[in-house]
Amino acid sequence: MSETYLVYHYCTVETFKSILQSKVLWLCDLTDSNDEQEVIRTFVVLWERVKKRLEQTDIPKDVLNNAIHLIDQQYETEIQTEPPYGVCFCQKEDISSQWTEYGDHTKGLSLGFDINWFIHNDRIKQQKPHPSSIQSNAIGCDTVIYHSEEFEAQMADICYKALKEQGTSAWIMCIRPTFKHYSGFVKNPTFEPEAEIRIVYYPIEGIEFAQKDVSVSDLKTNVKKHYEIPWIKGSSKALKSVCIGHNCELSEADVRKLLEENKIGTDVQIKQSECTYRIR
């Protein structure tokens, strides 16, 4: 990613005010999102299709069937425990699908954050993270992968090579960790217009990290379970722009006043949305 790369978080007016006041973004349970296949997509849909591809290969049937049995059992557990937490951004500032789904039908706002600010200031790596005793390995930011036949083929190839080289131990040495690695980023392809980038976190509740070196809070339980990351430190901030929805109650002057009242500064670009959505 370039030195400054803006991504956009669509929200309601109340959420906008809360973000300004708290100066943090919430990382929430991704399995509670609007896509009911979050995480499950990887461990159920993707895995089922990868299995069919593996069954067409030259892997000995006893090795493959044993591995599939072990992985099937493990994946039933995976979709019920240790969900990833995340905050989602769009790579497009002003599109109707985002306004209607996340921006309160154009009554909200689109907030432009520099994703690289979080890398440089919160020490969040550009990576697809995985559960780890080292906190910096358990959190990362990257683009969402929209499920495709090409991606299925890539995953099947990884599994094939692991099974050929490691036999029945491949499921624990490679296959399970790889699917876990991608589970917070694989989505139903019908959501592709969202052009999503995420910050994803894999905490392990009740277990302390051996190394804590990232600016992320402990678990918060007010309103709902979540973790928090700061987007401002001193005079440095990730918030670079605010796009006001076509039907938003706030004017540019109102937004400027809120920024000043919350000591955000005067260098945030404010603009009006060009999405002329009619509320019916």
PLM regions: where:
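Partner-binding and oligomerization surfaces adjacent to conserved cores of proteins
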Residues: 1-280
